[in-house]
Amino acid sequence: MSATTRSATSIKVLPEPAGLPEPLAEPAVGELRLETVLGALSDPLRLGIVRKLLLESEEFDHSCGWFGLDRPKSSLTHHFKALREAGITRQRQYGLERRSHVRVDDLDARFPGLLDLVADWTPTSR
């Protein structure tokens, strides 16, 4: 499985492997709302999660442990759920583990250029 990199940014788009579990409940492409997506991305931790998935992913999807976030499990569960319910990420259940990836094609279809802005954003120190 080889990744393709979009020319405008270094967003990696990996093909979906065969035999994946069904995704958890999420909004359809036509149900994605800009205010909901931007609301989810307004949290710096969630914005960082999405950027890491877009720019550093070498696998199709990742568990929350891959991100190296020093947060309680309940907090991470909340943030990943917010991203999924906003339609930004797709999650699948693998036994006891949930793995996530960004819905690049869906978000590009609904909000062209949004993910390029997210990928190009440079975090500032507070």
Regions flagged by a language model, labelled:
Residues S2-E35, R51-E56, Q93, R103-R126:
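Amphipathic alpha-helical dimerization/coiled-coil segments
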Residues D43, H79, P112:
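Conserved acidic functional residues
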Residues F60-D61, H78, V118:
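Secondary-structure transition/capping residues
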Residues G65-A86:
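Canonical helix-turn-helix DNA-binding module
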Residues R84-Y94:
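A short, conserved structural fragment
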